[in-house]
Amino acid sequence: MEAYGQSRQGATMVVRLPDGFDFDKITGHLDDLGFTRPSKDTGVWKGGVDLVAAIDPTITPELQYVAVLADRHLVVTSDQLSYAKEAAAVAQGDGDSLGDLASSRGLVSKLAEPAAALLWSRDFACSDLAMSQADQDAQDQADSLVARAGGVTPLTGLVMAMSPQRVLTVGALFEDSGQARDNLRPRARLAVGDAPGRGGTFSDDFRLVSSRTDGAAVMLQLRPKERSGFVLSALDHGPVLFATC
């Protein structure tokens, strides 16, 4: 199992390894590579940007700091020392996680078991997927498309989940059920309309299967037109018009 988390303070990766795995192999490799050993077994091994770049300049920055939690079969990594410590504490049950956030739990509870999923808590999607990442012409086009669709209100959470049957579920959370009803038709239109800042239209890649509200959430189901490919990775960065705030 793998998970990736990102916030304005840093990013983290968490990997669960199988029972019986020899975690001494990992700590031994970290030692050999030049990481600074922590004072306790569950502490953070310190690498840093210079060490990681010297090992291999193509290595992701999220491997600069590593916590090896053998008793939980987990390895936690981050691009920031403080964030690695925080993520490791959460992984050990000593800090609040997204699971403690009612809005995140509510969104996840609306999904069947996915093959892969992305979750943006609170208003993080409003910046991470924002149209402000596009040029001014694309932003102007987006404003016009949103107005023609009927207007939208800001998100308070967003999830995208791909099922084993390759159906993409998009859950957009709002302040209340009234906002969800108001956003249902505009969000559905935007999800199959033009994709300013990305090129083409979303309907080039997806067919809208269904759209409905579920409490304070708008739930869209889309089926990719291609039988293979990495659908979520094409939507994990902005601009994404149907997630606009």
Describe these PLM feature segments.
Residues 1-10, 16-245:
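Soluble, non-membrane globular domain cores that form compact, hydrophobic packing
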